[in-house]
Amino acid sequence: MNENMSFKELYAIVRHRFVLILLITIGVTLIMGFVQFKVISPTYQASTQVLVHESDGEENSNLSDIQRNLQYSSTFQSIMKSTALMEEVKAELHLSESASSLKGKVVTSSENESEIINVAVQDHDPAKAAEIANTLVNKFEKEVDERMNVQGVHILSEAKASESPMIKPARLRNMVMAFGAAVMGGITLAFFLHFLDDTCKSARQLSERTGLPCLGSVPDVHKGRNRGIKHFGE
């Protein structure tokens, strides 16, 4: 078979296997849609913010206070995700999951040169995610006050279930990716089946394989078109 195929020949292969490509695309897309909407439970995220600012009380110590609090930012985030604090949240809300599982739902972050700590909790229940986030920051406020004598913890915003967006799964993106992958997979399979077929489908292919010139060809006479043809001896 000639390795240098023209665009017309490639298009003919795709057109010949168009039904197969279409069925694969529809099937994969429908399966992905079923998995996205019926199998995978949606995950929601509730967020809150905490400002940690401890001052010495002196008028000229504002800059040094901020620099010190920025250095303590990672420490505060570690305390917020500590097992002991997770156990307190678990007991407060009467949760059945383990402290390590609860810790995996909590994501803390802090922007550069900022004393604000962002706290996000992910859960399949938006109301539960907001409840965990609010309970966690309240426990954190008491924890740093008792253990570190830091009274500059301020909760800037409470997490609300009604504002919790669904972050997982990204249904539209996954559906588009499944559609594209199905189309590419169907086209790949169409070419694979074509190249596995060793039969000659044209006089040119036969001439290329044998190296002999083609002197003539016999047209394909369909059954419905040979009614008016009289055979020899009739």
From Swiss-Prot:
Gene that produces this protein: yveK
Compartment list: Cell membrane
UniProt main location, coarse: membrane
Disulphide bridges: none
UniProt name for this protein: Uncharacterized protein YveK
Coiled coil: none
Highest taxon of the lineage: Bacteria
Lineage of source species: Bacteria, Bacillati, Bacillota, Bacilli, Bacillales
Signal peptide: none
Cellular component aspect of the GO annotation: plasma membrane
Membrane-topology annotation of the record: Multi-pass membrane protein
InterPro entries referenced in this protein's UniProt entry, alphabetically: Bact_polysacc_biosynth/exp (IPR050445), LPS_length_determ_N_term (IPR003856)
Keywords: Cell membrane, Membrane, Transmembrane, Transmembrane helix
Stated family: Belongs to the CpsC/CapA family.
One MF term in the entry's GO annotations: protein tyrosine kinase activity
Record-annotated membrane-spanning stretches: 20-40, 176-196
